[in-house]
Design a protein with these regions (language model features):
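Catalytic Walker B motif of ABC-type/P-loop ATPase nucleotide-binding domains
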Residues: 163-166
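ABC transporter nucleotide-binding domain
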Residues: 182-266
Length: 293
């Protein structure tokens, strides 16, 4: 019988390994993804993110370890677990000469979604992703942001419980990236989906429920964004209207900034204590919590 924690794990990976020649792409990887959360897989290119995704989706065989989706081993019941997953690949897999609707229709047919069932699902996705203005436009004539919306729609046709996004905003400008993230968050809430994100953008991981950081195929850190910031990032206090001699007397690391000084502190508690003990210096100040960057 599963305990309470196990029953909420929609993805369970234990001691996963994958080697390409002499390169250990995935090295004894173990982690959990909770149902309904935004899970972030963070790391630079070559860290092992895409390899793990390919194994999770059943596109690549593992050397050893286990991968379970909703308690089902994805190697023993590959087709069953594949229907639980929708994937947005880093490189779009849409057919550029075909229109948006033609792309979605041909993909839906692979899941047995045809006729009125397809038209109904298409309308639902139009309402969520708002691509009606270019439904009949060839994919090759879409902007990067528009194409990304269709990539997401394609992944959602069969109503998966897990949406995997492999570097979904790479190559997009900051404004378009934000638009895509607004769409993804809306999806997660309205469709009650689990979102598994791979990214090398720190600011995207900052919005996640849980973050796993990879380097050379191994986990080097994990936790909620709050836990990671408290563990690895220093907070700062910017103080104005004081002399450098007064700042030096505090015996903290600091640097000169415009109109003041920026002091490094380990956490909020330390900042509060410092301010209370030296109220005469902290008449004009700004406390900034460390960020994922």
């Amino acid at each position: 019988m599963q305990n309470e924690h196990e029953s909420t794990d929609i993805i369970r990976i234990d001691h996963l390994n994958k080697t390409f020649g002499d390169v250990k792409a995935v090295n004894d990887l173990s982690f959990r993804v909770k149902k309904g959360e935004l899970f972030a897989f963070l790391g630079v290119n070559g860290a092992g993110k895409s390899t793990t995704i390919s194994i999770l989706c059943g596109q690549l065989s593992k050397d050893s370890g286990t991968v379970q989706i909703k308690g089902i081993d994805n190697e023993r019941a590959g087709e069953q677990t594949k229907r639980l997953i929708g994937v947005v690949f880093q490189d779009s897999v849409l057919d550029k000469p075909l229109t948006v609707k033609e792309n979605l229709k041909s993909r839906a047919a692979l899941y047995g979604i045809t006729g009125q069932a397809f038209e109904k699902r298409l309308q639902e996705l139009l309402d969520i992703l708002d691509f009606g203005d270019y439904l009949n436009r060839p994919v090759g004539k879409l902007s990067g942001g528009q194409r990304r919306r269709i990539d997401i729609a394609r992944a959602l046709l069969h109503r998966p419980e897990i949406l995997i996004l492999d570097e979904p905003t790479t190559g997009l400008d900051p404004q378009t990236r934000q638009v895509i993230w607004n769409v993804i968050e809306k999806l997660r809430i309205e469709e009650q989906m689990t979102v598994f994100l791979t990214t090398h953008y720190m600011e995207e991981a900052a919005n996640a429920s849980y973050v796993v950081i990879l380097d050379k195929g191994s986990i080097v850190a994990e936790g909620t964004p709050y836990e990671l910031k408290n563990r690895y990032v220093q907070d700062t206090i910017s103080v104005y209207g004081v002399s450098e001699a007064q700042i030096k007397s505090l015996h903290y690391d600091y640097k000169k900034v415009r109109d003041g000084y920026r002091i490094k502190v380990d956490n909020t508690s330390e900042a509060t204590k410092l301010i209370v003990e030296h109220q005469e210096l902290f008449q004009d100040y700004e406390f900034v919590k460390g960020c994922m960057d």
